[in-house]
Amino acid sequence: MQNLAEIDELIKLISRLPGLGPKSAKRIVLKLINNREELIKPMAKTLAEVYKNIFRCKICGSLKSNSNGCNNCENNKNKYNKICVVENIADQWSIETSSVYQGYFHILGGTISSSNNQNKEDLLINSLLERVQNEDIEEVILATSATVEGQTTAFYIENSLKNTNVKISKLAQGLPVGGEIENLDDGTLISAFKNRQNFKS
């Protein structure tokens, strides 16, 4: 294989994406090279625009645009009384796609985990508590994964909200142990939401 520094660097970068190894990255790079005008040029332009304009909202953790703000918590035309708490944006997208839930989202940015040195201070938990206190929220749905880290995080949030009047519920235990929200099919998600269990009300 020719040692072209730019190509090698691109392969390394693409290999860092989830689910992609060096072989898959090489195939993607070759596809890009063979379709310079159709893929590389518009992709480079779009990536530059995303880098410049798209950020995580500091309030809810969802994606926001410099020009339009956050459609989840700032510019949402609907006034909801529920917040669904998820670990990451992929979880938010999965639940939105299933159409099982209508309400606000709050994206923590991970879980409390000793294995990767992620503490509660690293997550958007304090801003969740502020949203519950300052907005007309009646229910917080804890939609964390059925992993040790996900359940630990859910328990911590439940404990943090115990002195509020808000209803706290958790997705039904039909979720597979160790299962992550973003990998669940629509049927499982719909069942988990409809049969969610109350921690307190």
Put a short name on every predicted segment.
Residues 18, 37, 50, 63, ...:
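Conserved phosphate/pyrophosphate-binding and hydrolysis machinery centered on Walker-type P-loop NTPases
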Residues 30, 70, 83, 92, ...:
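Generic secondary-structure boundary/loop-capping signal
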